[in-house]
Amino acid sequence: MSNIEPTHVLTQTVKELSETDTLKGLCHHHHDGYPLPSGKALEEIVDLSRAIIFPGYYGKSSVNTQTIKYHIGVNAERMQKLLYEQVLAGLCFGDMCEKPDDNKFIELRKQAETISIMLVSMLPHIRNLLATDVEAAYNGDPAADSYAEIISCYPVIKALTNYRIAHELYEMHVPLIPRMITEMAHSETGIDIHPGAKIGEYFTIDHGTGVVIGATCIIGKHVKLYQGVTLGAKSFPLDKDGKPIKGIARHPILEDNVVVYSNATVLGRITIGKSCVIGANTWVMEDMRPKTKKYKKIKKDIIDIQYNNGTGI
């Protein structure tokens, strides 16, 4: 070990790591002058959006009726600026131009400006949706003492705030950035919602950890999920090269007032009708008619144990 030359090892390692064959699909060739997506900037965008949507619960400043307009204005202006930069970075990632000063880049800048302004203009609508989610979470959990507790503590509201912002960006065909925003919530809360999913009003997830909602899911109003639920794809067709065909509908549709209990798995492009109930640990891969219930059959093994003097426990 003492004969190893650090300089030689580093030189050889860098050479191997820089070989083109090892970088296929793993290296993004960035042109000078193009912005790069920034996780830190996106985290600030999420923080600002939470402070705007739930003033007084999030943010660095105290808010009252006299100062609320000022604080929302400052945060919205900052958010729009950061959004412009990050949307532009996403657009450049998805549509690489040859030079940063070419006509295409100028067009992408205009597009990013429009998208960032549109997203900020949608914040009242997003707040209205999230208000219904807060109400659903509160009404669905007897352990919750107040809306304040729901907004401040419950992971579902954090995850849905990220999702509802990311979904609007996804609908405006912004590359990369929507997924980065929802994956931040995934890391923070354990709730994995693809930004392409369509989710209606009054949606809630109790506890939340381990929930997966796929890209082509459609979820109606007043739907409630519990922890560990998967709304996933059963299978997907492959092209002639054996690769998955992208963009096809492959995840479930949950109509209004559906309840799915913990660790249930619902797979494929099936429809779960209105007011259905799916029990815990149940697998569902077929349509369910409205107002039907599906539970996993439990095998009951009765064991008679006599505990004499604690039996050593």
State where each predicted segment sits:
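Structural signal for interior beta-strand "rungs" in well-ordered beta-sheet cores
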Residues: 185-302, 306-307
